[in-house]
Curated annotation (Swiss-Prot):
Biased composition (Basic and acidic residues): 548-561
Binding site for ATP: 24-29, 48, 56-59, 72, 95-96, 117-122
Subcellular location: Nucleus
Naturally occurring in which organism (per UniProt): Xenopus laevis
UniProt subunit comment: Heterodimer of sae1 and uba2/sae2. The heterodimer corresponds to the two domains that are encoded on a single polypeptide chain in ubiquitin-activating enzyme E1. Interacts with ube2i.
Region (Disordered), start-end ranges: 546-641
EC number annotated for this UniProt entry: 2.3.2.-
Pathway per the UniProt entry: Protein modification; protein sumoylation
Name of protein: SUMO-activating enzyme subunit 2-B
Amino acid sequence: MAVIGALPKEVAEAVSASRLLVVGAGGIGCELLKNLVLTGFTNLDVIDLDTIDVSNLNRQFLFQKKHVGRSKAQVAKESVLQFCPDASITAYHDSIMNPDYNVEFFKQFTMAMNALDNNAARNHVNRMCLAAGIPLIESGTAGYLGQVSVIKKGVTECYECQPKPTQKTFPGCTIRNTPSEPIHCIVWAKYLFNQLFGEEDADQEVAPDIADPEAAWDPTKAAERANASNVDGDIKRVSTKQWAKSTGYDPIKLFNKLFRDDIKYLLTMDRLWRKRKPPIPLEWASLHNKENCSEIQNESSLLGLKDQKVLNVASYAQLFSKSVETLREQLREKGDGAELVWDKDDVPAMDFVTAAANLRMHIFSMNMKSKFDVKSMAGNIIPAIATTNAVISGLIVLEGLKILSGNTEQCRTVFLNKQPNPRKKLLVPCSLDPPNPSCYVCAIKPEVTVKLNVHKVTVQMLQDKILKEKFAMVAPDVQIEDGKGTILISSEAGETDANNHRKISEFGIRNSSQLQADDFLQDYTLMMNILHSDEMEKDVDFEVVGDVPEKGPQKPPEESVKNITNGSDDGAQPSTSKAQDQDDVLIVDSDEESPSSSNADVGMESASLKRKLPDEEAVSSTKRKRIEPPVEEDDDIIALD
């Protein structure tokens, strides 16, 4: 190997003797595997849950058209062995969050290198490397931007030392009643897809929100309208899916309900339109009269790239009808009770969302978007740049060589910019920060305070929204610190399922209660202090108090770096990654890697999930004996739906 021959003898020996774990075999992963074997690393393990898609072939050079549909990790191994047959590579087509890959598994490796595309997996690998005591090199790209950083237990910040920007969400009443931006209509259209063809979610309702406080002159009327009963003369409410089924998914009836009747109903909430331009209902018949029919555009007749053309309203109405018919047939083929899953690469599903979103944009007087733009926003996409991946993968190897040579103090967080900074540098290195003493992951005794309403939060919400989603646990076990060792949540299948729909107050949890949450897979324990509040904001289930930890003085970066947000164009640009970070939605390639960790000087965030990860199986470990929860007083508990 030419490269290893140029290294100092001690470093070359360390390279030959090391065993590396590469997590991810996508854009960065392909480049990284090539760089590693050409540098002299021959003992590698690579893991990736994904399979090869046609859209990967323009930049993930280890894959060819004949490989589409196969495991990325396995094909990457085969391709690398063709030009480096002496390498020993083990490939895993699996999720790194599988309990099989426990702390002992991670301890086999000299170091781990992340080439991931989602925050949940990054959090998990961060914790596993901390537990195993091995260095981790984190990386990410987003378009022309990139970042590499080193994480070492007790020496540097971990991936979670600095809080990541929270997911961008929109109030339900904005989505349902008063959209003001194209993204609001696109989110509504995705919700509509699930309400009609997929898994129904009460939080994704698309019908006008009659409980919108802004729509009522008297604030008390909002609650009254929301709770109106059939006796009061209200029409009996049925779900959107039930209604659609009753019509046989008739495209014209669906169109008139969604874009005419619901809009007319919104207009009756006249207070909403005092300072807004009112929506204009659409009528199927008027769009398809003789005059408008002549204006319907045939996509095949459009010049240029058809997905980048904006059609007229009549054409989007026609596209809506055709996509509904296609999706209806897909449901019928799957049988009774079947559900469809929205995928940006599924043509009928993408056509449906494009048509529905644009029709709603037109109704609310917004400029309509091309299918390409809708797909970018709905699928959280930033075009991936192969050169960026190549540069970042090279930097990963350089940082790895510093670690193997024993010069961890020389490691840097390096940002790749879109344009040179004032010092004409594209690559900007910054000193690594020490561990954050307030970090709820790598602190000696991780502890956090969570503000919530104990009479509204259920055990299921505690497990899914707080422990798994917010604190990135995989298989949490929760014990109430009540002197009895009451087990509230167990990762053993079925052991505490009966608790799921009960409010946590029913277990004696109140203000100042303490919960100990353990994830035995991650070798991670978090002490949670409960701060009860009866006055949580609307649509806010909980709040982490002091989520932004105080940091001590920082070392000045070796090069100044401007703080960047999506869409800025002020020179240096190291950052973007979460599709939720700004009002016009920061778009990230859901198929690609994105900048991974935040920094005081540079806003680098993590990418969106590529897919819903499978539920992990229960973790085998020694568990405390479950003690039945107290069934005592339900003192003044108010059960709220």
